[in-house]
Amino acid sequence: EKADWNDYGLVGISIIHSGQVIPGLTLARLLRKRFPHLHIVIGGSVFNRHADLLDNKQALFKDFFHSVIVSEGEKPLEELVNHLKTGQALATVPNLIYMDDEKVIHNTKAEALPYDQLVCPTFDQLPLEKYLMPYPVLPYMSSRGCYWGKCTFCTHSFIYDSYYRKENETRVAEEIDYLSKKYKTKYFTFSDEAISPNAFNRMSKEILKKGVEMRSLGMLKFESGDKESPELFEDVHRAGFLMLFFGLESANDRILSIIDKGCDQATEKSVLKNSSDAGIWNHLYLFFGFPTEEREEAEDTIRFTVENSETGTGHIHSVGQSIFALEKDSAIYHNPGKFKVDRIIHDPDRDMAIVFDFDIKAGMPREEVMDVYEHFDSVIEETFPSRKIWNYLSREHFLLYLDRFGKEEILNMAHSASVEP
């Protein structure tokens, strides 16, 4: 249905990935040109991370949008709506960046709302029936920020101002139950940066206690065996978590140490076994080319993955590999010398870049990193037969497959049938 834009006074556009910048700003410009009465406000992590660059970007405020909200936006957006309705000056809207008389103004930031003041998400105005899914898979967050928050490459907590807080686990179970009944689905994606073991333990027990029928996936950080025990994963699986995503990054202890992952290879191996034995599908994220990483250290990661693959112990079921990317506002970006980064290359034609090329003093050159990456890609083609299935599905679609067929049946499918991409 076509919207009557005359009924609206404000449009908010979230841009959370660099690939959304062009379509997001194109939409903003078209709306602004066609409906000049609208106030266009931008949110999301991309412009949050570029807030310091907006002082000399008056053209963006003139041609594309009127304001930007940084950090968490619930309270600032409410304040912005109220100010626009009453015609008040925007100077007291927290977290707002806007232009006044050719000058870009950064308003004072407000403290984020406590979790008990955040409302349950609603999806009422989304055409869920038009998604190419037999059932909707709804996103849900039981926490904001990262409880660890130390990984030297990571910027995921930046939009939360490195402030971690979580929902009461009883309320999590109640809200999942409510959303499941309201939208007639049992499928969810927990979008937390990482669910802590203690929170996972209490959450699973509350979901089981309340009898909520749920199927979901979640993100975890590797922790010691007493924190991520067999008993924890048994409860997690019984509560409905069929798939867990772990940030392995590396299986070399030196690299893990300078990344500040807070774990070692032995911990990674133990946790993956505990999770797999409970019936959970384990997916790993890893990368090659962290500054100072030598080829022998990258081979540790390859060897670990192969030894625990489908053709090995069977504790790793899928994997997503990449080449290390140096991101703006990471610990490495702010202290490159500590990580033997000789130079971060700032291209003047890419003044809103988030990822930067760099030169190193130690470690594999970029060409060798690419060679390792391509070698790993060929290795996992042989050691993960089920890659023919999961490599071509989004994680939400794959969650439905896991619930429909089960982990073992999917693995058997790949072994017993010829599945062409």
What are these regions (language model features)?
Residues 16, 45-47, 193-195, 219-225, ...:
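Active-site beta-loop-alpha junctions enriched in small/polar residues
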